[in-house]
Design a protein with these regions (language model features):
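Active-site-facing substrate-recognition patch
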Residues: 1-68, 80, 84, 88, ...
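Short glycine-rich phosphate-binding loop at a beta-alpha junction
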Residues: 63-76, 145
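Residue-level signal for inorganic ion chemistry
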Residues: 70-72, 118, 172
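Short helix-loop-beta junction
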Residues: 88-97
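Residues at the starts of beta-strands that form the adenosine-phosphate
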Residues: 97-98, 143, 170-173
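Mobile, glycine- and charge-enriched loop segments
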Residues: 134-147, 151
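Acidic, divalent-metal-coordinating active-site segment for phosphoryl/phosphodiester hydrolysis
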Residues: 148-160
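PRPP-dependent phosphoribosyltransferase catalytic core
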Residues: 158-180
Length: 180
């Protein structure tokens, strides 16, 4: 969280308007620590939403392990360099396949609006239109690490995850640097 202690100050500086740089050295170890915790969660899930699926039996754990792990980025209008750096680092660290970037069309949406308005803006702006047939095929049945720089309302992550699930991803796990 950007309003907390610890790395919050460094995160606030990194997310400031106009800043687009790679993750600074001071944040790299904490980012990888969070990535490790996320990896443990990814290994413990099957991607199903029901209560029974959250408890993976010994018989089904091998099925989960066989699912490919992919990294998908959400295009950033303000910090494309930062998001790509995070995505490459996570893919490398977690041995995930870099799969693609969810495109963003239209003008940037406002964050100071009601939830329904924000959802409508986000839903109309995210797209998989630029994805190749090969990338779409590799998405089917995959576990996905969804990478973005920060989140506020959560709608971008929710809509992007929904798009990926509808396109065939078995599970989607969000990863963001900061939460406002």
């Amino acid at each position: 969280r950007m309003d907390g202690l610890g790395v919050a100050g460094a995160l606030r500086e990194l997310i400031e308007p106009g800043t687009d740089a790679e993750v600074p050295n001071a944040l790299r170890a904490p980012v990888l620590q969070v990535a490790e915790r996320l990896a443990a969660l990814v290994e413990d899930t099957t991607g199903e939403n029901d209560e029974d699926a959250r408890t993976v039996s010994a018989d089904s754990s091998s099925q989960t392990d066989d699912l490919p792990l992919c990294a998908v980025l959400i295009e950033s209008r303000r910090r494309p360099r930062l998001v790509r750096h995070i995505g490459r680092a996570l893919a490398h660290h977690l041995a995930a396949i870099p799969l693609g970037i969810i495109g963003v069309r239209g003008e940037p949406g406002r964050h100071d609006v009601g939830s329904a308005y924000r959802l409508a803006e986000v839903a109309s702006s995210l797209t998989l239109d630029e994805w190749s047939d090969d990338a779409r095929a590799r998405l089917r049945g995959a576990r996905v690490i969804l990478v973005d720089d920060w989140t506020d309302s959560g709608w971008t992550l929710t809509v992007a995850a929904s798009m990926l699930r509808r396109a065939g991803a078995a599970a989607v796990h969000p990863f963001v640097l900061a939460q406002r």
